[in-house]
């Protein structure tokens, strides 16, 4: 027998997968288990599709009705709310890192993602803890008005459950639904600078080297892996980490810092991962990744990162790893740790500033992609086409020298020797072209790859701010219409201000690093190009002198 439900509110579907509901309409449900707050069923007009679980009341065969909680499980509304604490046994214990499957590691992030969906999938249990669970309330009615009888309605929720604004929890933060934590020890200050808000500098800045990629084995050689020696200069105590350790840290960072553009880890490679070229490429990119991490005022002070860089004791490592995985100030809750400056900022000005950066980041992303494509093609020609052409030229000169020897009385040994040397010189120049990309083009491509990753994060981060702006406008409109208390609208505006300051601070840091990184990258590229062409010129000059001596 199909389950029945009654529509508590009217709902207008926005795509072909969603159906319309009318208030008090009788519905047939395919299941009473919701998926991300949505149910599937059939309305009185025979249309089958999705609709919000919070908009309906399920008719139970027993006395009373059934409502659906946020985790998607049907529950009698008369049951007391679950108050259990997080069950440690539910958490997968991966303390023995050497036994992890080498194939299970980070994958490339899709364009325009800061990893929110990845974090959601891999760490969903953090959001489903009882202390984070909130049964979805109707988008057109305020939760406190149901209990207290106050007039008015809350700002409508975004029903697109795939929106990063919803998934990240920032919508819940802006609407005041993220629980406060008493006695929060963690805090991150934002201060005003001449160019706008910026993260307060790390009072103990440091750098960390990435050196000595070494192939190691375990299980009597059955499994192999590469370890890297990391040496922070504030301790000068080296630690050794595998790529999967970086992967674990990266996932912690994704889970915690929703409004920060995280540098992407270099790609995972299943085959050829022990080849020297790949090992050196990954090392170069880990160096850039580490440099970006240590230069960021917030990321560099993250306890999980400090633990990653400094812990050498196995027991302490396990304790710190678990502590990082149980961190409650993650996602939208991280915004609770921010301390804002007292200076006033008009939200209209902030919105315009964000729009300017959005256009800038889009154009820069296109430019970086184009430059990366051109440099990659040039490197490919160095390795193949240029090398081959110079070898052909050298062989042609060698052929000419051999032909001059066919009539001995007129062969002129000095000239034959000079022509033969010319051929060998051009063959050597071809090898020089093939070796050159590792000195300049590959390193330049590493920087471009880093910024492709950073830029791909910003569309989702900007979307969070745009969503917050929309909630402010909605709340003020509802306050003007008398459907929301002004103090509630002010609260939405205040929390939107937090998101705005965080985004501007991140934009400020991005520009600071961009100016430094591209200055250094292009300087290095040009210097190496000059050295290269000087070497080519020197080889040609030596060959030229042979003809002067004839």
UniProtKB/Swiss-Prot annotation:
Residues 347-550 form the BAR domain. It is a peripheral membrane protein. It holds the Pfam family PX. It is found in: Cytoplasm, Cytosol; Membrane; Cytoplasmic vesicle membrane. Gene3D superfamilies: Arfaptin homology (AH) domain/BAR domain, Phox-like domain, SH3 Domains. Residues 206-316 form the PX domain. Its main location: cytoplasm. Residues 86-102 have a biased composition (Acidic residues). The keyword Iron does not apply. InterPro entries: AH/BAR_dom_sf (IPR027267), PX_dom (IPR001683), PX_dom_sf (IPR036871), SH3-like_dom_sf (IPR036028), SH3_domain (IPR001452), SNX33_BAR (IPR037427), Snx9_fam (IPR014536), Sorting_nexin_WASP-bd-dom (IPR019497). Keywords: Cell cycle, Cell division, Cytoplasm, Cytoplasmic vesicle, Endocytosis, Membrane, Mitosis, Protein transport, SH3 domain, Transport. Residues 128-144 have a biased composition (Basic and acidic residues). The keyword Cytoplasm applies. One of its GO terms (cellular component) is plasma membrane. PROSITE patterns: PX (PS50195), SH3 (PS50002). GO terms for biological process: cleavage furrow formation; endocytosis; endosomal transport; endosome organization; intracellular protein transport; macropinocytosis; mitotic cytokinesis; plasma membrane tubulation. Residues 62-152 are annotated as: Disordered. Belongs to the sorting nexin family. PANTHER family: SORTING NEXIN (PTHR45827), SORTING NEXIN-33 (PTHR45827:SF3). The PX and BAR domains mediate association with membranes and are required for membrane tubulation. Plays a role in the reorganization of the cytoskeleton, endocytosis and cellular vesicle trafficking, both during interphase and at the end of mitotic cell divisions. Required for efficient progress through mitosis and cytokinesis. Required for normal formation of the cleavage furrow at the end of mitosis. Modulates endocytosis of cell-surface proteins. Promotes membrane tubulation (in vitro). May promote the formation of macropinosomes. This is Sorting nexin-33. It comes from Xenopus laevis (African clawed frog).
